[in-house]
Amino acid sequence: MREPRFWYGPVSLGSVLLAPIAACYGAVAAARLAREGTRAGCPVICIGNYHVGGAGKTPTTLRLVEILREIGETPVVVSRGYGGTLAGPVRVNETHRAADVGDEPKMMARHVPVIVARDRVEGAELARREGASVVLLDDGFQNPALAKDAAVIVIDAARGLGNRMIFPAGPLRAPLAPQVARTNALIVIGEGHAADDIAQGVVQRGGLVVRAAFVPEESSLARLRGARVLAFAGIGDPGRFFATLAKHGVELASRKEFADHHPFTEAELKALADEAQAGGLTLVTTEKDLARIEGDPALAAYAAQIVPFAVTLRVEDEGALLDFLKARMRRARQARQ
């Protein structure tokens, strides 16, 4: 879906009119947050966000995978597989398309074992059988089915939470206060102060707050140096993708926004390719978008023309984050003895 513009502006007539529906939605969401979940056979670390749309969960998950591997853990990611047709539980492999398992699981499976499961408890059980010493739950913060031993929330420092109203009047998935109360660590990504009060609330409740930034992979930058590009994206926050390109010196001659998880058609990609060719531009998109395009054999010729812009997450105080993860896993394992 494409986010309504009024979510990230002052409180508007649209949000006021939707407030009664939002109140009902929020009451149900708050009740779900309070429910006890089923405990998995190994520690579960949830990477989530407070709101609908993108916040950087996927690169955060992949960085946590690297951190955990460095201390001898065997992480396996469990994902609902949003946008895919398979209910699972199933381990993502090279034969799966993004249409089967979702674009994010397909992309992450290049780096880490990924289990797609509508039932997150069953997903965690399969992850354990696949050798997981710790489960990384991709999203699912507001879903009560699986108990979380640690909740790591990501938030954009500049964008924050918009009008801070509950869906559909605003972007929040549930009332903010109970979400903050259940946050064990907050990763504030980028520059800005829109999340400062939330960070303060997490600290006051004994949680960890660290700052981080997206850093482009050198291989991506090398392919774009000196080029004028046509950038396109169908993610939660396309503006952040475009801003990251510009920040690192990439000349954006044209930019195209699509809805999050948009299923690109051959006609759309042909139009993009034709515009790029006419203007002498390089086509560039996100890894997640390219995962959807590559999964469709009819789009293979277009996929070969597109440069994926890959980013990693750089955490400022990674030592504090590592200590946090160790402590939460140690506590979780002691509770299971």
Swiss-Prot record:
GO function term, MF aspect, one: ATP binding
Enzyme Commission designation: 2.7.1.130
GO biological process, alphabetically ordered: lipid A biosynthetic process; lipopolysaccharide core region biosynthetic process
Entry GO CC: plasma membrane
Source species, domain of life: Bacteria
Amino acids binding ATP: H51, V52, G53, G54, A55, G56, K57, T58
Pathway: Glycolipid biosynthesis; lipid IV(A) biosynthesis; lipid IV(A) from (3R)-3-hydroxytetradecanoyl-[acyl-carrier-protein] and UDP-N-acetyl-alpha-D-glucosamine: step 6/6
A Pfam family recorded for this sequence: LpxK
Transmembrane stretches, start-end: none
Keywords: ATP-binding, Kinase, Lipid A biosynthesis, Lipid biosynthesis, Lipid metabolism, Nucleotide-binding, Transferase
Catalytic activity, as annotated: a lipid A disaccharide + ATP = a lipid IVA + ADP + H(+)
Signal peptide range: none
Function description: Transfers the gamma-phosphate of ATP to the 4'-position of a tetraacyldisaccharide 1-phosphate intermediate (termed DS-1-P) to form tetraacyldisaccharide 1,4'-bis-phosphate (lipid IVA).
Classification via HAMAP family: LpxK
Record family assignment: Belongs to the LpxK family.
Name by which UniProt lists this protein: Tetraacyldisaccharide 4'-kinase
